[in-house]
Amino acid sequence: MSASASLPVTRAAAAPRITVLFSTEKPNANTNPYLTQLYDALPDAVQPRFFSMREALLSRYDVLHLHWPEYLLRHPSKMGTLAKQACAALLLMKLQLTGTPVVRTLHNLAPHEDRGWRERALLRWIDQLTRRWIRINATTPVRPPFTDTILHGHYRDWFATMEQSTTLPGRLLHFGLIRPYKGVEVLLDVMRDVQDPRLSLRIVGNPATPXMRTLVETACAQDARISALLAYVEEPVLAREVSACELVVLPYKQMHNSGTLLLALSLARPVLAPWSESNAAIADEVGPGWVFLYEGEFDAALLSGMLDQVRAAPRGPAPDLSQRDWPRIGQLHYRTYLEALGKDGDAAL
């Protein structure tokens, strides 16, 4: 059953106060802006608390809201992983015994990496305890017992006060954490095969592995058109890098929800991405000329023709992101929490 997020947002006069424990740490300068903006958007009736295992095991709260639950189960060391998984099992027993509802946001259809049978078993247990799911795009399959649709918010306000660069003609950009599934190795190979002298490629982000770092550094050394900033970058730097490009290129091997795509659109930059049901829905939502979708292989023939296609495409001054405003998103999360508790969710609207 899917709850629509299309109702008008108003503040209820007597909204029930609830305490929500989030599975993430207290926001800081390095926190994912999606999370920071969500916490800021929650209405006053929601008292947020942030995760520590001690807090989760020993304190009282009305709802546990999980984002990326696999990260509660992982540690760089084997013993650390076992300890975290044992603590997580205790937490799940507590939730089951107390009847504390779990709300879970579906950022990915499945974790990007498989870390073994214990993690898989604990994630299945979490799934069984989840009272209400939040999907952040309307193409994600619904899950029982209830799934609410609350679209991923934009980053327009987040970057509004940050300096932006003058666009560099022909600049292509790939940014974000550099992981194998994002196809950066294919992008580098294709760029070397492209003969168009107008094009240059910029890679910005922190490599997930030493092998990924070496791959990008080697490509930069072999082709003067390719440059990179291989580090975690603060948002002001990211705003300048994104605004400097003509096109953001995301040749992901798999793509369902992408904060990177929405970040690029929030800074009014066109994006090239693989066709998927979710990407096609975003392309329709934001208007023509902003999201360019390809099917099949990502190759030199595709990339060679993109610059002229992007320049020729009619588009408005900015993509339409009105369905992704944060005040609305905060109220809709409050409604989900109330309904997970068996209360009237309309009190939130």
UniProtKB/Swiss-Prot annotation:
Pathway: Glycan biosynthesis; xanthan biosynthesis. It comes from the Bacteria. Disruption phenotype: Cells lacking this gene display a non-mucoid phenotype, indicating that they have a reduced abundance of polysaccharides relative to the wild-type strain. More precisely, mutational interruption of the gumI gene leads to accumulation of GlcA-beta-1,2-Man-alpha-1,3-Glc-beta-1,4-Glc-PP-polyisoprenyl (GlcA-Man-Glc2-PP-Pol), and a decrease in xanthan production of more than 95%. One of its GO terms (cellular component) is plasma membrane. Its EC number is 2.4.1.251. GO terms for biological process: polysaccharide biosynthetic process. Residues 1-14 form the signal peptide. Optimum pH is around 8. Activity decreases below pH 7.5 and above pH 9.5. Keywords: Carbohydrate metabolism, Cell inner membrane, Cell membrane, Glycosyltransferase, Membrane, Signal, Transferase. The keyword Glycosyltransferase applies. It catalyses: beta-D-GlcA-(1->2)-alpha-D-Man-(1->3)-beta-D-Glc-(1->4)-alpha-D-Glc-di-trans,octa-cis-undecaprenyl diphosphate + GDP-alpha-D-mannose = beta-D-Man-(1->4)-beta-D-GlcA-(1->2)-alpha-D-Man-(1->3)-beta-D-Glc-(1->4)-alpha-D-Glc-di-trans,octa-cis-undecaprenyl diphosphate + GDP + H(+). Pfam families: Glyco_trans_1_4. It is found in: Cell inner membrane. It is an enzyme of class 2 (transferase). Nonprocessive beta-mannosyltransferase that catalyzes the transfer of a mannose residue from GDP-mannose to glucuronic acid-beta-1,2-mannose-alpha-1,3-glucose-beta-1,4-glucose-PP-polyisoprenyl to form the lipid-linked pentasaccharide repeating unit of xanthan, Man-GlcA-Man-Glc(2)-PP-Pol. Is involved in the biosynthesis of the exopolysaccharide xanthan. To a lesser extent, can also use ADP-Man and even GDP-Glc as sugar donor substrates in vitro. This is GDP-mannose:glycolipid 4-beta-D-mannosyltransferase.
